[in-house]
């Protein structure tokens, strides 16, 4: 596809039928993907394989407590999704203006702001609140 690094998303959700997440992880590694964004359930079962193969992991979180767990299991970056981002499991209706500074204060790893950023003013606000 390209000789440049690229990323993919792996949403890990509970299902009635088994989902081949192990095969997805293998395809990500064998395909040379260097950045993965995970969402839904914890990426913990895949972290050793991703790390051993040089894959950077960004985990999408809707609460600081989820972000802290993501940091503990070794993700490289957390994407904090304020309520404005919409549609993510575990939402507690907390907006980005509250979540962004709470996450950046609690975490040692980089935090990316997600949701409610529509123009340069929103970007400046996210940066001012400590996001990268």
Residue spans of the language-model regions?
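Active-site entrance/lid segments in N-terminal catalytic domains of soluble metabolic enzymes
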Residues: 1-110
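Catalytic alpha/beta core domains of metabolic enzymes, predominantly
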Residues: 94-132
